[in-house]
Regions:
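Structural signature of transmembrane alpha-helices in multi-pass secondary transporters
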Residues: 1, 28, 51-52, 59, ...
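Small-residue-rich packing faces within the transmembrane alpha-helices of Major Facilitator Superfamily
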Residues: 2, 29-30, 53, 114-121, ...
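Conserved kink/hinge residues within transmembrane alpha-helices of Major Facilitator Superfamily
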Residues: 2-9, 94, 256-260, 348
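Small-residue (Gly/Pro/Ala) motifs that create kinks and tight helix-helix packing interfaces
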Residues: 92-101, 157, 227, 347-355
Length: 389
């Protein structure tokens, strides 16, 4: 997905965000049907790639559409409502998947997406507004460079974390650096670059992007490490682990809409900064749990993490989108999705590295890394107060 986020976001600025979003829904729904009916592993793999392309089309313009659906004075409310939906999905998704697998075969995990996708397409066709378009041309070379750069970032990071041969890692890193430098150089003279360098010249946007990247790295570290931590270090069962993971997204779903509404009146830098302080504290409290904690000991710590992330997410999205001009909403939305995916990929790779160092103590080390990322995100968030003056 991460390889195509920025190209699809740029395409959205040219043809309209509504078209890209609906096309993403159609591709994702069709690919889900192919997954459910797949007759071989190669067929399933190809269908999963198509699913990723569809999801990329949805994610890259989702935040941009929110900007055009809600008036500026209610943008924080819109971001909060979006975060509510994401939080509920995170909380309910694993339970629904487990329920499906308890009564049906794995293809039904994909088949259930088909009626939901058709329903979503119908709503999108009816409700999504048309958006302004730019007259710029789609830059195919930049799209290829962006796909190679971000795709290689995820690949190289994963290979390095899993102890791949050094030659493979170094070769991937070399190509990544060359393509990345070429991409940046190609974007510099452009008025509406695919990699939104023009937006990074705005201090609030740059700091908001850094805050998002670090926060999602912290989230990625936590969400991948915690199941290992609960099962390997604390000796909890798989069922217990699933239940113990639930408080985080539930609290996010509860608090994110509140934080979004508050961000329409209170500086997002303040809300986001304190939210990341809460996440830092929650991750450290989890990392230093007693040897035999009760369920309540774990739940209230997970709730602190969810509360911190919930108070960060919506205000940061509002700050990031409002710091970009309306005609560059696609580029800003693309950076939102790219920061999320690259941050989560970075976190997952660091967990693999920590587990490679120690299966027993690796999860705790990963949580400490997550707290460090959240701390950096908090500092970057508060720095926006000075940058915005």
């Amino acid at each position: 997905m991460v390889a195509t986020i920025l190209p699809f976001a740029a395409l959205g600025e040219i043809v309209g965000y509504r078209r890209v979003y609906i096309a993403g829904l159609v591709v994702f729904t069709g690919a889900s049907l192919i997954c459910a009916l797949s007759w071989s592993l190669p067929t399933l793999a190809i269908a999963r790639v198509l699913q990723g392309l569809g999801a990329s089309g949805i994610m890259c313009v989702n935040t941009a559409l929110i900007r055009f659906i809600y008036p500026t004075r209610l943008m924080g409310t819109g971001m909060g409502n979006n975060a509510l939906v994401v939080g509920v999905a995170f909380a309910v998704g694993p339970t629904v998947a487990s329920g499906i697998l308890s009564v049906a075969a794995w293809p039904w995990l994909f088949a259930v997406n088909v009626p939901l996708g058709v329903f979503a397409i119908a709503i999108a066709l009816y409700a999504l507004p048309p958006t302004p378009r730019t007259k710029s041309r789609f830059d195919v070379v930049s799209a290829l460079l962006s796909a190679v750069t971000f795709g290689l970032y995820v690949f190289t990071l994963g290979e390095a974390a899993q102890g791949a041969p050094r030659a493979i890692t170094l070769a991937g890193l070399a190509v990544l650096l060359v393509c990345g430098a070429w991409l940046v150089r190609r974007q510099l003279p452009l008025r509406s670059p695919m990699l939104p360098i023009d937006l990074y010249r705005r201090p609030v946007f740059a700091l908001s992007s850094l805050t998002a990247l670090c926060s999602f790295a912290a989230q990625g570290l936590a969400f991948v490490a915690l199941p290992f931590y609960f099962q390997t270090t604390l000796g909890r069962s798989q069922v217990d682990t699933g239940l113990l993971m639930t408080p985080w997204p539930v609290v996010v779903a509860i608090l994110a809409p509140i934080a979004g509404r508050l961000s329409d009146r209170i500086a997002p830098a303040v809300l986001g900064g304190w939210g990341m302080i809460g996440l830092t504290a929650g991750l450290l409290l989890l990392a230093f749990l007693p040897a035999h904690p009760s369920v309540a000991d774990i739940i209230w710590r997970m709730a602190i993490c969810g509360g911190g992330f919930g108070f960060f997410q919506s205000p940061n999205l509002r700050a990031l989108m409002s710091s970009a001009p309306p005609e560059r909403a696609g580029g800003a939305s693309g950076i939102v999705a790219t920061s999320r995916l690259t941050g989560q990929a970075t976190g997952a790779a660091l967990v693999a590295l920590c587990l490679g160092l120690s299966a027993l103590h690796g999860p705790r080390l990963a949580l400490e890394f997550g707290a460090a990322f959240a701390g950096v995100a908090s500092v970057a968030s508060f720095m926006r107060l000075a940058a915005g003056r």
